[in-house]
Structures are given as structure tokens and as C-alpha cells.
């Protein structure tokens, strides 16, 4: 019975640590960039978009496709950074679970 209590305490401790790491990650800022940094997309670690900025050179009413492509590039870059940081931050807990 004591072993089960220890496992529960350990699980609760890990849960608190995970929650703190998630909060830390959510507070971080990630900036994704397109080719030549013409478009930047800024997100928080919990994948909420903060801003998207365009350099004047990329804004051409006759070429909206390029603007769209670069916007997609910047957003995907930021999201990939968040995913990588999440793996590094939260992956450490996988081997520590008591069950």
C-alpha cells in the first residue's frame, strides 16, 4: 500500500512540474520567418498568434500568391519551432512517469 502512495505522490509532483513547464512554454515567444525575412509571424508557445508583419517589398497587389506563400512559410516556421521546443521541454517527462 505504501508503494502506491509513493507512486501517487511522485505522479502529483510530476504533474506540477509538467504544468509549470507548459506555463513557461506558453510564455515564450517564437518568431517564424519566410525567405529573406519578408514576412514574420510571431506566436506564443501555446500557439496563439501575436502578430504577422510584412516588409513593404513583399506587398504587391499584382502578386498576392507570393505574399500568401511567404505568410504560410513564416507561420509554419514558427509552429515548427514551437513543436520542437515542446518536444524538448515536455519529452523529458516521458521517462519519469511512475507507471
From Swiss-Prot:
Q: Which InterPro entries match?
A: YbaB-like_sf, YbaB/EbfC
Keyword line: Cytoplasm, DNA-binding
The Swiss-Prot or TrEMBL record annotates one GO molecular function as:
DNA binding
What are the GO cellular component annotations?
Answer: bacterial nucleoid; cytosol
Q: What is its main location?
A: cytoplasm
The organism's place on the tree of life at top rank:
Bacteria
Q: List, alphabetically, the SUPFAM superfamilies matched.
A: YbaB-like
Fetch the Pfam families from UniProt: YbaB_DNA_bd (PF02575)
Instruction: Give compartment(s).
Output: Cytoplasm, Nucleoid
Provide the assembly information: Homodimer.
What family does the database annotate? Belongs to the YbaB/EbfC family.
Summarize the protein's role.
Binds to DNA and alters its conformation. May be involved in regulation of gene expression, nucleoid organization and DNA protection.
Q: What protein does this entry describe?
A: Nucleoid-associated protein SUB1611
Amino acid at each position: 500500500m505504501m508503494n502506491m502512495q509513493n507512486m501517487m505522490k511522485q505522479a502529483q509532483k510530476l504533474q506540477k512540474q509538467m504544468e509549470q513547464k507548459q506555463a513557461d512554454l506558453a510564455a515564450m515567444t517564437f518568431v517564424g520567418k519566410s525567405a529573406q525575412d519578408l514576412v514574420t509571424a510571431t506566436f506564443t508557445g501555446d500557439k496563439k498568434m501575436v502578430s504577422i508583419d510584412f516588409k513593404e517589398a513583399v506587398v504587391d497587389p499584382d502578386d498576392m500568391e507570393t505574399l500568401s506563400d511567404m505568410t504560410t512559410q513564416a507561420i509554419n516556421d514558427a509552429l515548427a519551432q514551437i513543436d520542437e521546443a515542446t518536444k524538448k521541454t515536455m519529452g523529458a517527462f516521458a521517462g519519469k512517469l511512475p507507471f
